[in-house]
Amino acid sequence: DASMGGLGADSVWTEATIKELRRELADAYAGRTVLVTGADGFMGSHLTEALVELGANVVAFVRATSSGALNNIGHLRHRLRVVFADLTDKTSVDYLIRDLATARDRPYVFHLAAQAHVGESWHRPYETVMANVVGTLNLLQSIVDHGLELEKLDTAGTSEEYGNVREAGA
């Protein structure tokens, strides 16, 4: 698999291989503008920390809370830009995207913000649709509305998106 330094599923991750992969990733992300939505969540915080370590100029989009606390990326606060806002509020998303449009490079966007707990989605369907569908739509529409040219946009999902797959049909 060329996207992982030639490593396939059966490859051994040696220290040298990991070092080479870090070098390749640093070449790709060092000094580059990167937006991470959901940056203080489980996946987002790990990605944000890795990108900061690689030298990226990270813009961490974090849901505004009454406390303003950063639970998972607080230790990185001096090494990145944090934007507290709500993806379901198109105006705040527009503000962010307008600002990103002034970046000297084409930003990478990792859209990880979501209501990710499946059980919670059954108990709070409206909030789930707002966060996962409307929030994503607002982000994408703002990118289009402001003519933001991206290097790449990646989103994350879960296996739950596919439903239950019977073994025979898999």
What are these regions (language model features)?
Residues 1-170:
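N-terminal Rossmann-like NAD(P)+-binding domain of SDR-like oxidoreductases, especially those catalyzing
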